[in-house]
């Protein structure tokens, strides 16, 4: 046996120690959700930047099931944390958090959010927590916009300056992708922002929306001088799902036209 572990609400498995000289960092989060927009976004950045896996978090409030991989091996669902240090234009430490599931209960989501927000504050020395997720519409657009909300006016203005962004107001962001940045601000005095890519729930995955978010992140954070270096994974997916996207868009457009026709008053 490699060691004994008592299962608690959260079990942390350290893969590699984070650099000891981190002065401040930015944390980017993308948990599974509608059209997997957030997870696709963060997974693409992790891959493009060759980020290093530093930790895994196991949560007792995840769905009670394990995943079976293509080779037949069992895999326990987890949240995974990665780190990347960018040196161009000065040192910039980025942490990425994504995973297989979100907690299944309201209490679980809040406890999970607090656990990660505290880690962002105390271990990662985060000055900004960015959550990526989906903004649900009843139609699909050729060029998705990114809807921005934030815990501070200063951060909001910074992100809303990027191309193809809109202010998100008078609504809710459900789940960990909304609660983590909000809780980081409320309890740990870390600025938080939500970047929500425009999509429709008919899609199981939407790399277009994820790519739109990465374009906004790159304009704001200056991650790369060439945004296409951050999106090869998504660009390939976009090509693969093009027929699915076209079919879904046409169906939604027809449904909308029928609804508009049905709503027109009869005039004689």
PLM features: what roles do these ranges have?
Residues 52, 115-129, 186-191, 223-225:
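Secondary-structure boundary elements
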Residues 31, 97-99, 132-133, 173-176:
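Short His-Asn-centered micro-motif
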Residues 103-156:
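Internal, conserved structured core segments that host functional sites
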Residues 137-220, 260, 266:
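Catalytic cores of processing enzymes, dominated by hydrolases/peptidases
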Residues 2-100:
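N-terminal short beta-loop-beta anion/metal-coordinating cradle
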Residues 202-268:
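A conserved C-terminal secondary-structure "cap"
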Residues 55, 95-97, 128-130, 191-196:
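Hydrophobic/aromatic beta-strand patches that form the interior of the parallel beta-sheet core
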Residues 36-40, 107-111, 115, 175, ...:
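Conserved active-site and cofactor/substrate-binding residues in soluble primary-metabolism enzymes
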């Amino acid at each position: 046996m490699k060691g004994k572990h008592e299962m608690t609400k959260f079990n942390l498995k350290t893969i590699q120690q984070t650099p000891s000289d981190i002065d401040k960092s930015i944390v980017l989060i993308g948990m599974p959700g509608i059209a997997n927009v957030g997870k696709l976004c963060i997974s693409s950045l992790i891959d493009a930047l060759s980020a290093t896996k530093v930790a895994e978090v196991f949560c007792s409030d995840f769905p009670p099931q394990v995943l079976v991989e293509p080779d037949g091996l069992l895999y326990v669902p987890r949240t995974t944390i990665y780190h990347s240090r960018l040196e161009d234009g000065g040192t910039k430490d980025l942490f990425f958090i994504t995973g297989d599931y979100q907690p299944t209960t309201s209490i679980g989501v809040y406890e999970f959010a607090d656990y990660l927000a505290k880690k962002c504050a105390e271990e990662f020395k985060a000055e900004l927590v960015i959550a990526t997720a989906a903004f649900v519409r009843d139609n699909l657009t050729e060029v998705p916009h990114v809807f921005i909300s934030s815990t501070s006016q200063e951060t909001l203005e910074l992100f809303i300056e990027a191309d193809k962004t809109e202010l998100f107001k008078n609504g809710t962001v459900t789940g960990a992708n909304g609660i983590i940045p909000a809780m980081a601000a409320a309890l740990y005095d870390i600025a938080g922002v939500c970047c929500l890519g425009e999509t429709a729930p008919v899609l199981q995955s939407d790399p277009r929306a994820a790519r739109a978010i990465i374009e906004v992140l790159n304009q704001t954070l200056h991650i790369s001088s060439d945004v296409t270096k951050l999106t090869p994974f998504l660009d390939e997916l976009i090509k693969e799902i093009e027929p699915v996207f076209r079919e879904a868009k046409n169906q939604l457009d027809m449904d909308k036209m029928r609804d508009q026709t049905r709503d027109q008053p009869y005039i004689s």
